[in-house]
Amino acid sequence: MRPDCTDFRQLFLDDVPMMDMRAPVEFAKGAFPGVVNLPLMNDQERQKVGTCYKQQGQAAAIALGHQLVSGTTKQARMDAWVAFTQANPQGYLYCFRGGLRSQIVQGWLRDEAGIQYPRVKGGYKAMRTFLLETTQQAVAQCDFVLLGGLTGTGKTDVLHQLDNVLDLEGHANHRGSSFGKRATAQPAQIDFENQLAIDVLKKRARGCEQFVLEDEGRIVGSCTVPLELYQGMQQYPLVWLEDSFANRVERILRDYVVNLSAEFIAVHGEEDGRRLFAERMLQSMANIYKRLGGERYQRLSEILRLALEEQQRSGAVDLHRGWIEGLLNEYYDPMYAYQRAAKAERIEFAGDAVEVREYLKARARRQPHH
């Protein structure tokens, strides 16, 4: 029989399949990529057992648990666990601390199905701690450089051409600006942190000791950059990406209008997709109402509304350039110019996409600064 697992590093490096015994409410707050939630108890059962534990102690709580998870309920769950073990013979099971819940399921599988299936010692809590430490160690030990630039210069396009990138926006499923929400939901905060840590772990295992990050705020949509990394980002050196105003307008039109509306249609179907896309765009503009001021907001949101109507009617997106140009000229560029001035002494290189990409590749080949 395979022993219970204590080597968390290998679990994540190899994407080892795992089944999570915790209740759905616990799982929803955060788990690990690719893990399957096959709970011992559902939310209501867990709540009842928890109340019983507080009032009558452990023995009574265990007895109630066995009573609640019995008969056809137990059989249905057993069938799901057995199917998982057969589909994933190299996998593991875990619960919150690697304690009672995983041991009960292990025992049932062994005694009633003849299956020896190992658990992760320390459970979710130990793996989560390991991943938090992974990110902290990288911040302490590795070399970081930030990629900055005005809105629409194509920072994400450049990042996707490098292999030593930590893609915060990718992990957060958000483009980082007021208009950055995607058609699909963002991950829970814990899932975001865990994905980021596993990315770090895998890249360091390949020998990567220098990372490129986009110059972000602390908040990427609803996800928050881990504090130790964000603190580092206040002092890491910067590489500044430059492009013409016209190119930037076209790129924003592509990413935030053409591609995003296609994303909404792919997720929600033609009719709902178009409607939800239009609602999202108007809401994104409304979200920066205070920062734009009343007059500017009225003018730009009216251009946006007319552009959305024209897009709905004919599929043409040309009118969108009006509000994009206005937002860049009157809102984003002045804000970024101020930020760039504040960070000027940290900028070690500036150039177009090709120059910046080559500079960052050459920089990664140099010895780390640490």
UniProtKB/Swiss-Prot annotation:
One of its GO terms (biological process) is tRNA wobble uridine modification. One of its GO terms (molecular function) is transferase activity, transferring alkyl or aryl (other than methyl) groups. It catalyses: 5-methylaminomethyl-2-thiouridine(34) in tRNA + selenophosphate + (2E)-geranyl diphosphate + H2O + H(+) = 5-methylaminomethyl-2-selenouridine(34) in tRNA + (2E)-thiogeraniol + phosphate + diphosphate; 5-methylaminomethyl-2-thiouridine(34) in tRNA + (2E)-geranyl diphosphate = 5-methylaminomethyl-S-(2E)-geranyl-thiouridine(34) in tRNA + diphosphate; 5-methylaminomethyl-S-(2E)-geranyl-thiouridine(34) in tRNA + selenophosphate + H(+) = 5-methylaminomethyl-2-(Se-phospho)selenouridine(34) in tRNA + (2E)-thiogeraniol; 5-methylaminomethyl-2-(Se-phospho)selenouridine(34) in tRNA + H2O = 5-methylaminomethyl-2-selenouridine(34) in tRNA + phosphate. InterPro entries: Rhodanese-like_dom, Rhodanese-like_dom_sf, SelU. The keyword Transferase applies. Residues 12-136 form the Rhodanese domain. Its EC number is 2.9.1.3. The keyword Ribonucleoprotein does not apply. The active site is at C95. PANTHER family: TRNA 2-SELENOURIDINE SYNTHASE. Monomer. Belongs to the SelU family. Involved in the post-transcriptional modification of the uridine at the wobble position (U34) of tRNA(Lys), tRNA(Glu) and tRNA(Gln). Catalyzes the conversion of 2-thiouridine (S2U-RNA) to 2-selenouridine (Se2U-RNA). Acts in a two-step process involving geranylation of 2-thiouridine (S2U) to S-geranyl-2-thiouridine (geS2U) and subsequent selenation of the latter derivative to 2-selenouridine (Se2U) in the tRNA chain. This is tRNA 2-selenouridine synthase. It comes from Pseudomonas putida (strain GB-1). The lineage of its organism: Bacteria, Pseudomonadati, Pseudomonadota, Gammaproteobacteria, Pseudomonadales. The gene is selU.
